[in-house]
């Protein structure tokens, strides 16, 4: 799936126009005619689609040339249009809190640069009030990454620091991020009964005063972009959330989030919470509403998407889903869900993430944290674009869209049509014959039948059959009927448990 900004040659849509666009996509994918009604900014739309069509139909589509889109001006409390979803990455703060996932200052700086290439809207890079080293690291990122402007698009990442509702934390945050072109602070406070009673030991009124006074103090220091985070919002009373959010908005907050801190909510439940707060909080439509979900019950991605469907327009995520306990909503899953299905079942929501940077970013985070993803991890796992079943292999060899809804190239994996095929006991004749051809062997039916029979015997002894095994099977078969057995090297895609060896 082409991950590019597209517009019809000679035609620039204007703000508010509705146009029909088509695009040619790899291996049989094509973007169906789609009426797009969200505003344009003298430019084009970041399009993607997961609906397969025939090759014949695909060739009829207009091949649109990629263009570069200027990013709209960043306004803390307002989005460029109602369907735009900001991506707030917290890999370097919440993600680093994953047990065993601590990063060195140079590693945090490198990941921040990688996140900028990914084009996250906001990166939360640390907790300056927690230690001198953390303060200096956040400051370094603000001075460097926070001032690096993409000349073509005008993109500049927002650099965010987190703080408790304490003046010393807020002062430390300001001193650390004030060097960035777009500094931001996230001030959090607990809002659930259990947290207020046992952790804060404060009444609801005291918590509201603590939050609002902290927002006003942050604004007095120079922060223009101030977000209030409701810790344990998923277990908080709805009416109280409406009240504290409303007061925060009056105090000058430009964004608010309601965090499912302990990962207890179900998608329908969390979506309904967001919907209720959007409908009953004074001033909520004048700021950005954000969602922050943890994965204790395995539904962080689903909850985040439910929040977007309910009206949230900022998602807080981490690369590979790393974070406290079972982790956070994974950036790659949320972004690709929005990219793949946003136009079809979510009223056209979209992000500006450069998804081609996803795999490289995932690998870097894995290597630096030592937290490797499981092979079947969606989007970035080693098995994501690999097939062993004979039926699936046959389909993939005919047209990849038969069993893959995403293009590997779209997330930064470069593959050929025949790669992604793993030979084993479930593999069929088509896959084995095709692999032999890639290795340079042109065999008649009799010879291939003999080799395939011995291939089947070999699969009873080995889980996976390598190219060397196939060559040995041919060589020991006698007359090699090669078109030279030319020793042609293969660029096949063979997965291993650690993703660092995958691409």
Swiss-Prot record:
Pfam families attached to this UniProt entry: HCS_D2, HMGL-like
Effect of residue 294 to A: Lost catalytic activity
Pathway: Secondary metabolite biosynthesis
Domain of life: Eukaryota
Uppermost EC category: transferase
Protein residues bound to Mn(2+): 94, 292, 294
GO cellular component, one term: chloroplast
Cell location: Plastid, Chloroplast
Cofactor note: Strongly activated by Mn(2+), Co(2+) and Fe(2+), and weakly activated by Ni(2+). Exhibits 20 percent of activity in the absence of divalent cation.
BP GO annotations: L-leucine biosynthetic process
Domain Pyruvate carboxyltransferase: 85-359
Enzyme Commission code: 2.3.3.17
Record note on pH: Optimum pH is 8.
Transit peptide, from-to: 1-49
GO MF term set: 2-isopropylmalate synthase activity; metal ion binding
Function per UniProt: Determines the side chain length of aliphatic glucosinolate structures. Involved in the biosynthesis of glucosinolate derivative natural products such as 6-(methylsulfinyl)hexylisothiocyanate (6-MSITC), a compound found in wasabi with diverse health-promoting properties. Catalyzes the conversion of 4-methylsulfanyl-2-oxobutanoate (4-MTOB) into 2-(2-methylsulfanyl)ethylmalate (2-(2-MT)EM).
Self-association state and partner proteins as the record states: Monomer.
Note on domains (UniProt): The N-terminal part of the protein controls substrate specificity.
Entry's family note: Belongs to the alpha-IPM synthase/homocitrate synthase family.
Protein name per its UniProtKB record: Methylthioalkylmalate synthase 1-2, chloroplastic
Organism encoding this protein: Eutrema japonicum
């Amino acid at each position: 799936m082409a991950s590019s900004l597209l517009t019809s040659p000679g035609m620039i849509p204007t703000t508010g126009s509705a146009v029909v666009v088509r695009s040619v996509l790899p291996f049989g994918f094509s973007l169906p005619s789609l009426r797009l009604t969200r505003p344009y900014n003298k430019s084009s739309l970041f399009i993607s689609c997961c609906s397969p069509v025939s090759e014949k139909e695909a060739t009829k589509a207009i091949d649109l040339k990629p263009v570069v889109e200027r990013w709209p001006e960043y306004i803390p409390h307002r989005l460029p249009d109602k369907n735009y979803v900001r991506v707030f990455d917290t890999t370097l703060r919440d993600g680093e809190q994953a047990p065993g996932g601590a990063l060195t200052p140079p590693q945090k700086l490198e990941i921040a640069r990688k996140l900028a290439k990914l084009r996250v809207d906001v990166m939360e890079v640390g907790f300056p009030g927690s230690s001198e080293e953390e303060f200096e690291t956040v400051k370094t990122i603000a001075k460097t990454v926070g001032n690096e402007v993409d000349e073509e698009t005008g993109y500049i990442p927002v650099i965010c620091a987190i703080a408790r509702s304490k003046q010393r934390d807020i002062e430390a945050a300001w001193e650390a991020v004030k060097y960035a072109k777009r500094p931001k602070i996230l001030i959090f406070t607990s809002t659930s009964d259990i947290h207020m009673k046992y952790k804060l030991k404060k009444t609801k009124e005291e918590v509201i005063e603590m939050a609002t006074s902290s927002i006003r103090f942050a604004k007095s220091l120079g922060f223009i972009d101030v977000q209030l985070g409701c810790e344990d919002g998923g277990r908080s009373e709805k009416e109280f959330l409406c009240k504290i959010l409303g007061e925060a908005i009056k105090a000058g907050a430009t964004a608010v989030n309601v965090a499912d801190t302990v990962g207890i909510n179900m998608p329908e439940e969390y979506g309904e919470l967001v919907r209720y707060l959007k409908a009953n909080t004074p001033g909520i439509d004048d700021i950005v509403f954000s969602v922050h979900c943890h994965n204790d019950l395995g539904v962080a991605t689903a909850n985040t998407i439910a929040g977007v469907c309910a009206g949230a327009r900022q998602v807080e995520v981490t690369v590979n889903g790393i974070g406290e306990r079972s982790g956070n909503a994974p950036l790659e899953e949320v972004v690709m869900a929005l990219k793949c299905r946003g136009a079809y079942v979510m009223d056209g929501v979209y992000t500006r993430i450069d998804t081609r940077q996803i795999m490289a970013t995932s690998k870097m985070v894995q290597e630096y944290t030592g937290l490797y993803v499981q092979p079947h991890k969606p989007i970035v796992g080693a098995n994501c674009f690999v097939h062993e079943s004979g039926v699936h292999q046959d389909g993939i060899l005919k047209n990849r869209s038969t069993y893959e809804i995403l293009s590997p190239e779209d997330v930064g994996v470069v593959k050929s049509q025949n790669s992604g095929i793993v030979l084993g006991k479930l593999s069929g004749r088509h896959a084995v014959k095709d692999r032999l051809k890639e290795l340079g062997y042109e065999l008649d039916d009799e010879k291939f039948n003999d080799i395939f029979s011995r291939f089947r015997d070999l699969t009873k002894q080995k889980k996976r059959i390598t190219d060397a095994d196939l060559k040995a099977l041919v060589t020991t078969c006698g007359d090699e009927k090669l078109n030279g057995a030319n020793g042609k090297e293969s660029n096949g895609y063979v997965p291993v448990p650690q993703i660092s060896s995958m691409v």
